[in-house]
Amino acid sequence: MAVPKRRMSRANTHSRRSQWKADNVALQHVKVQGQDVQIPRRLVKAAQLGLIDLD
């Protein structure tokens, strides 16, 4: 029979979850409509096609 895992205290849960951090997205230098912009790599094609607004 399966045995449930032990309950983890809130302090232990928060300290365990706080070990990872999100990385900053690498920005690409792209010239769009005569303007030099820095955008994430995944948006380069959309920006060149004019599908997204660059303010």
From Swiss-Prot:
Top-level taxon of origin: Bacteria
UniProt xrefs under Pfam families: Ribosomal_L32p
NCBIfam families according to UniProt: rpmF_bact (TIGR01031)
Lineage: Bacteria, Bacillati, Actinomycetota, Actinomycetes, Mycobacteriales
Keyword Nucleus recorded: no
Keyword field: Ribonucleoprotein, Ribosomal protein
Record's protein name: Large ribosomal subunit protein bL32
Amino acid composition bias (Basic residues), ranges on this chain: 1-19
Family (UniProt): Belongs to the bacterial ribosomal protein bL32 family.
InterPro entries registered for this protein in UniProt: Ribosomal_bL32, Ribosomal_zn-bd
GO biological process: translation
One MF annotation (Gene Ontology) recorded for this entry: structural constituent of ribosome
Keyword presence, Ribonucleoprotein: yes
GO cellular component labels: large ribosomal subunit
Gene assigned in the entry: rpmF
Organism: Corynebacterium jeikeium (strain K411)
Region annotation Disordered: where it falls in the sequence: 1-20
